[in-house]
Amino acid sequence: MKAAIFEEYGRPFHVTTMPRPSAGPSDVLVRIRASGTNPLDLKIHDGSAAHARQLPPTVLGLDMAGIVEAVGSDVTRFKVGEEVYGMVGGVGGLQGTLAEFAAVDPDLLALKPANLSFREAAVLPLVVITAWEGLVDRMQIKCGDKLLVQGGAGGVGTAVIQIARHFEADVFATGSKSSRDVIERAGATFIESSEAVVDYVGRLTGGHGFDKVFDTAGGAALDASFEAVRKFGHVASALGWGKHLLAPLSFKAASYSGVFTLMPLITGEGRRHHGRILLEVARMVEAGKLRPHLSGERFTLETAFDAYQAMAERRSRGKFVVDIG
């Protein structure tokens, strides 16, 4: 099969031929039709993600959508010819999705939403799993909650907004002036990120604070999240790194939880839950409650590194996809 590999951290990919994997007894062999890209892929590629190592030479790519080519003797949930999607590799020694085929743990898969193309489905797995784990598993979002999303225009941010709206939360999201349209189309009330926290908390919550806050940006945005949450509220972060003062949170008796979406890929624990999340998201998509946001640029395996460069340059608010097969 053809695959795009890189030999050294930070170096461009090159397309090579490598043995096609086979489905072991507990595997699903997927013919990959599209590979979605994520900012995390950039950090894995340049070796800067200490929490997400992938030693070169290797194939990158976390997300994909494709067609079941073969199933192992122990696999009962999928059949040859079914269209699937998932976050299945590209970290922890697992082959990535910039390849024509991958042997995949079926627990990481779900049937692709019937109303999406392979390209559209391939950009969803990481961002919707991250959003779901923070909103549903950690903060238990519910109807009527006032939710603040720190960084609402990115892939995770727009997924958080749409999933929270599905649960009938009242959603607000921060972003730059240029991101206002993306945030509002996703379904949130826009807050310009330059506005002081005390000002928008006063303006939108009467000074009480938000019931729940989902931080997608980390750094100063996480500190702002602690300031913006109400007493007994909850903050979840997908980028809760570095040093942060907990006093603003503690003095409100508010709680915090981190979201580490890669844990099941790296450790093997909790993979079935990822598949269940993707199944629920597929139902949302088919009901018209969630839509992916893609860039119009097209890439192939031969130009996959160009997709990574486009992502690094932030040439589009939509996600970039590599077409395969």
Question: Regions from the language model: what does each represent?
Answer:
Residues 19-36, 48-90:
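Glycine-rich beta-strand-centered segment in the early N-terminal region that forms part
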Residues 72-74, 171-182, 219-222, 242-243:
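Short glycine/proline-centered loop/turn elements that form peptide/ligand docking sites
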Residues 77, 87-151:
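NAD(P)H dinucleotide-binding glycine-rich loop of Rossmann-like/cofactor-binding domains
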Residues 122-195:
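Mid-domain Rossmann-like dinucleotide-binding core that forms the NAD(H)/NADP(H) cofactor-binding site
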Residues 189-257:
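Glycine-rich cofactor phosphate-binding loops and adjacent beta1-alpha1 units
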Residues 248-297:
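C-terminal substrate-binding/catalytic core of Rossmann-like NAD(P)-dependent dehydrogenases/reductases
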Residues 282-294, 305-325:
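C-terminal capping/lid region of NAD(P)-dependent oxidoreductase domains
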